[in-house]
Amino acid sequence: MAYRKRGARRETNLKQDDRMQEKEENKSTNSVIENKNGTKTQLSEKVLSQKEEVITDNQEETRIADEVKKSNKEESKQLLEVLKTKEEHQKEVQYEILQKTIPTFEPKESILKKLEDIKPEQAKKQTKLFRIFEPKQLPIYRANGEKELRNRWYWKLKRDTLPDGDYDVREYFLNLYDQVLTEMPDYLLLKDMAVENKNSRDAGKVVDSETAAICDAIFQDEETEGVVRRFIAEMRQRVQADQNVVNYPSILHPIDHAFNEYFLQHQLVEPLNNDIIFNYIPERIRNDVNYILNMDRNLPSTARYIRPNLLQDRLNLHDNFESLWDTITTSNYILARSVVPDLKELVSTEAQIQKMSQDLQLEALTIQSETQFLTGINSQAANDCFKTLIAAMLSQRTMSLDFVTTNYMSLISGMWLLTVIPNDMFIRESLVACQLAIINTIIYPAFGMQRMHYRNGDPQTPFQIAEQQIQNFQVANWLHFVNNNQFRQVIIDGVLNQVLNDNIRNGHVVNQLMEALMQLSRQQFPTMPVDYKRSIQRGILLLSNRLGQLVDLTRLLAYNYETLMACITMNMQHVQTLTTEKLQLTSVTSLCMLIGNATVIPSPQTLFHYYNVNVNFHSNYNERINDAVAIITAANRLNLYQKKMKSIVEDFLKRLQIFDVSRVPDDQMYRLRDRLRLLPVEIRRLDIFNLILMNMEQIERASDKIAQGVIIAYRDMQLERDEMYGYVNIARNLDGFQQINLEELMRTGDYAQITNMLLNNQPVALVGALPFITDSSVISLIAKLDATVFAQIVKLRKVDTLKPILYKINSDSNDFYLVANYDWVPTSTTKVYKQVPQQFDFRASMHMLTSNLTFTVYSDLLAFVSADTVEPINAVAFDNMRIMNEL
């Protein structure tokens, strides 16, 4: 029986105590009694509990109740763990959502490799002329559909591919234009691509391997006239050595000839001499006395180079493109870290920690706050901090600070950091947290002031508020400097540079910091215990003992930053980045405490490498902008504007190499499109598009997949004989047919005219470029004639889905052989209007192309410069004093 027990709690407690005493006296009690005692011990723990306990005399029930409670506890623990895991997972999900809005998340090595792999375009050697057309031999068919033994040469497209979609033919021309832009050479040297003419009498050469192959095929064709063979045998180059000019014979379609002639007339190569190379080196490095630059040879008169395209800020990616800007700054940061020199001859970590321990008199102390001063100090952290600071400034990448408020040494080191690095380099929340910690831990307690209660969202930073409240001149003066520590924007050699304050560059600001720290250490800390005051004073003492080294460190930091900054070619726009580089204040302490006397400056080879990578990326960036602007203009003029725009912008970003395009948010894609639309088209690219536009009909004729129109009728129309195909549903002219323009029809959407004519049994010719599907099976063709063509026109009234069908009936068909005595005449309710491609005429296709006989294009201009440095220990800063004075 179970009953409620309210009044006898004290009695139970006494009995419990007696039994516990008995247990202590007699340790040989049997296990049953021990079990009972164990159960009652649990009860004694709950004596003072306010909850009512249900006591039962049934041992089994007690055990079950205990197990239930135990399982409940375990369940609640598991629930807590699940909730905790869920919370952590939620944070990870939120972080992942943020990550997805930033286009690059790849290992650092791969980003660096992508940047270094961007080479100038002229490194691609042209081995062939640009061609859209090639001559092909096609059989001739007799009136009865049998193939003759004779062949005829026609100009056909080399790459006859049509993409899927409603605007197939227009997309074909857009893709063709993109292909031309990709293959458009910056220069052509015909001598490099010339090959031997096998049929030449005197080992002459023709312009490229394709010309040689065409000549060979024509020479071997039995129907070729003797005069043409003799002409091929005479084909060879003509050299005018005194003018450095050579003429090569070529076989080209007139349109291809126009393209290649344009490329030859508009080459981007310029003469190269020593002056150009020397002026190519950034002026600040040329004038830096620490670097000795020398050229030990003259360049020949045939030397050429392609001027890099270094236009600035055409898209302003720093403005309202947070994800794209984050990716660019990340890749710049990774590149910059790879070129910042490693610190040398740092103070031994062990020796420094031992010295700091002596200064702190740690053996005699009982408090532990000062032992924290020594945590995390190591040379790796010092070197990492040095690289992070310089690389973040070079890439204008925002940093966030990580620190522990109770580690006063970290906060004092943070005061040096905030003195030498402009405020803009830190994410605002992190900067506020660090400044607030310094004020409430060091500055306000020193003067006995109340803690600062900072309101989140206050436009002023804690240091700005403190500057108005602190009466001490030195401390207020230092706060004023930190509050106004901003980059100066200076345009040097046409590039916007973010320059440090002169007081930081020469290290004088460290003396200002030390004066403020000395004032703080002399204060009484009236509201704090003596131990607290002593800890702060000893932390300040540790830093002030390193005054000379800190001045040197500041000068070294500024010198390396400015020297590497001279190699940056894109404007250094400063915008806070979405992601940040974490900086531990303990690593700043490591840097302050372990910096030695050894000067480190970038090697000339490192500078040249950094400069080359920056130039190549910047030039590629501008060229890809030119391509994208040209394609957008072409899409607009081909009425593909709405459909193709996003893919054009995606292609543009892919070609910049560093972006993971699938992660770029759509809003930034369309904003990028709007910026690209405003830019003018580069003249070469515009001329090339106009060439394509003027010759669209010739290109359509040469295609086997593009028709110039379609004829539709209710009544059957007989197949006509065509000498190129045999019997086909092809019309070579539109005489006698009522014509309607397809483009106009799609624009107006008025199909009444077509349906009326068809219902009156009048064939209609819809004229305009559209693709057709070739099908040589007669049975499958007849089965789908009416359904595919007429139904779509009359019922769906959608001309843009029209697919005209070309089919052939000739002696080569798989399932049908047409002979003269067949009574059945094949018919069709649709005909394809297709103009005859241009016949290949050898005389009209032979062109002489002219180029320089020889010149050499150099892509790496700095390879000619031999460079060395003075002994780093003698290296001087901008003020003509040694960078490191504390020797």
Swiss-Prot record:
- Where in the cell does this protein reside? Virion
> Which InterPro entries does the record associate with it?
Rotavirus_VP2
The GO terms describing molecular function are: RNA binding
* Annotated region described as Hydrophobic, given as residue ranges: 401-421, 429-449
* PTM info: Sumoylated with SUMO1 and SUMO2. Sumoylation of viral proteins seems to have a positive role on viral replication.
Q: Where is this region: Disordered?
A: 1-43
Q: What keywords sit in the KW lines?
A: Capsid protein, Inner capsid protein, Repeat, RNA-binding, T=2 icosahedral capsid protein, Ubl conjugation, Virion
List the Pfam families. Rota_VP2
Q: Which residue positions hold the site described Interaction with the intermediate capsid protein VP6?
A: F231, M235, M846, M848
Specify residue ranges for compositional bias: Basic and acidic residues: 9-27
This entry carries the following GO cellular component terms, namely:
T=2 icosahedral viral capsid; viral inner capsid; viral nucleocapsid
Write out the ranges of the annotated region (5-fold hub): 1-87
Q: Where is the composition biased (Polar residues)?
A: 28-43
Instruction: Give the function comment from the record.
Output: Inner capsid protein that self-assembles to form an icosahedral capsid with a T=2 symmetry, which consists of 120 copies of VP2, with channels at each of its five-fold vertices. This capsid constitutes the innermost concentric layer of the viral mature particle. It encapsidates the polymerase VP1, the capping enzyme VP3 and the genomic dsRNA, thereby defining the core.
Which family, according to UniProt? Belongs to the rotavirus VP2 family.
Stored HAMAP family: Rota_VP2, Rota_VP2_A
Domain remarks: The N-terminus binds RNA. It is necessary for encapsidation of VP1 and VP3. The N-termini of 10 VP2 molecules form a cylindrical hub underneath each 5-fold axis of the inner capsid.
Q: How does it assemble?
A: Homodecamer; each decamer is made up of two conformers of VP2, called VP2A and VP2B. Interacts with a VP1-VP3 complex. Interacts with the intermediate capsid protein VP6. Interacts with NSP5. Interacts (via N-terminus) with NSP2.
- Name of this chain's protein: Inner capsid protein VP2
User: Can you name the source organism?
Assistant: Rotavirus A (strain RVA/Human/Japan/AU-1/1982/G3P3[9]) (RV-A)
